[in-house]
Amino acid sequence: MSLAPEGRRLLRVEARNAEVPVERKPEWIKAKVHMGPEYIGLKNKVKSAGLHTVCEEAGCPNIFECWEDREATFLIGGDICTRRCDFCDITSGKPRPLDMEEPQKVAENIREMDLRYATVTGVARDDQKDGAAWLYAETIRRIHALNPGTGVEILPPDFGAVPELVQQVFDARPEVFAHNLETVPRIFKRIRPAFTYEKSLRVLTMAKADGLVTKSNLILGMGEEDHEIDQALVDLHESGCDIITITQYVRPSKLHHPIDRWVKPQEFVQWSQRAEEIGFQGVMAGPLVRSSYRAGKLYAQAMQRLGRTLPENLAHLAGEKTARQEASAVVAQMS
């Protein structure tokens, strides 16, 4: 009998995945390290204060660039998800009780780090009657109260697309409401069995109708075809999605979905151009782009294109900022 690293019996899908060897990464997937003074100062502060971010704990390759601009990502709701997606490295199972003090703790972490923009994501909590909607909403409220100069991007699960649950999060007024579609209809059930393509789009439509700036992500390299990517982009835009990030799937372990292909940087440039043509207000595509990468920059760009003025307390997010992982920049580095 095959066992997972934590000692449990392998799921059938994991056993099937494990039959495919882990793929070797191409040269363009390897990130170059650029450690500036802001990054070094922030890292020292995080270490001395015992703070926790997804950026460090997930080993994100973009931490140097994001921290240099004082942006970071936090995970709430615990570290065990009630759903299992075939690309995701978060453990699935029965989670521990919610930490009701977590919203305040996250807000205090952000204050200690003096962040300009924070992305807050989290696990699905289907064990909770409200899907932990209160936790997401309260975290937004506490961050805003304690850090008026920090933009907040919330990246929750779909809450089953139940209007009264998602409305709790909308009412907390994050700067950006993000929900990641991730893949195309044909392989959606295999990749995200506890979600549906339609509900993910519906959540974005509801957020847009409530006046929020909306955002989503597509992961390439999991078996999708070009025409399916194009249709997913159209579907997202028609559902009210303002900002799109397009990324390369990188397999966390042999138990996860095998990589179908490594998408070349030049192709990401083409998808970025296509997303602009479709009408997205903010686009970021590249092999090492992640959904929270340069999130403050994309929010400011979308606000400008939507004809909205940045709030005075967030005016510092405007202006040109680097994006070393953006596809055209990667292509330029390769030449």
UniProtKB/Swiss-Prot annotation:
It is found in: Cytoplasm. [4Fe-4S] cluster 1 binds at residues 55, 60, 66, 292. Binds 2 [4Fe-4S] clusters per subunit. One cluster is coordinated with 3 cysteines and an exchangeable S-adenosyl-L-methionine. Pathway: Protein modification; protein lipoylation via endogenous pathway; protein N(6)-(lipoyl)lysine from octanoyl-[acyl-carrier-protein]: step 2/2. It is an enzyme of class 2 (transferase). Its EC number is 2.8.1.8. Keywords: 4Fe-4S, Cytoplasm, Iron, Iron-sulfur, Metal-binding, S-adenosyl-L-methionine, Transferase. [4Fe-4S] cluster 2 binds at residues 81, 85, 88. It catalyses: [[Fe-S] cluster scaffold protein carrying a second [4Fe-4S](2+) cluster] + N(6)-octanoyl-L-lysyl-[protein] + 2 oxidized [2Fe-2S]-[ferredoxin] + 2 S-adenosyl-L-methionine + 4 H(+) = [[Fe-S] cluster scaffold protein] + N(6)-[(R)-dihydrolipoyl]-L-lysyl-[protein] + 4 Fe(3+) + 2 hydrogen sulfide + 2 5'-deoxyadenosine + 2 L-methionine + 2 reduced [2Fe-2S]-[ferredoxin]. CDD domains: Radical_SAM. Pfam families: LIAS_N, Radical_SAM. Its cofactor is [4Fe-4S] cluster. GO terms for molecular function: 4 iron, 4 sulfur cluster binding; lipoate synthase activity; metal ion binding. GO terms for cellular component: cytoplasm. SUPFAM superfamilies: Radical SAM enzymes (SSF102114). Residues 67-281 form the Radical SAM core domain. It comes from the Bacteria. InterPro entries: Aldolase_TIM (IPR013785), Elp3/MiaA/NifB-like_rSAM (IPR006638), LIAS_N (IPR031691), Lipoyl_synth (IPR003698), rSAM (IPR007197). Belongs to the radical SAM superfamily. Lipoyl synthase family. HAMAP family: Lipoyl_synth. This is Lipoyl synthase. It comes from Micrococcus luteus (strain ATCC 4698 / DSM 20030 / JCM 1464 / CCM 169 / CCUG 5858 / IAM 1056 / NBRC 3333 / NCIMB 9278 / NCTC 2665 / VKM Ac-2230) (Micrococcus lysodeikticus).
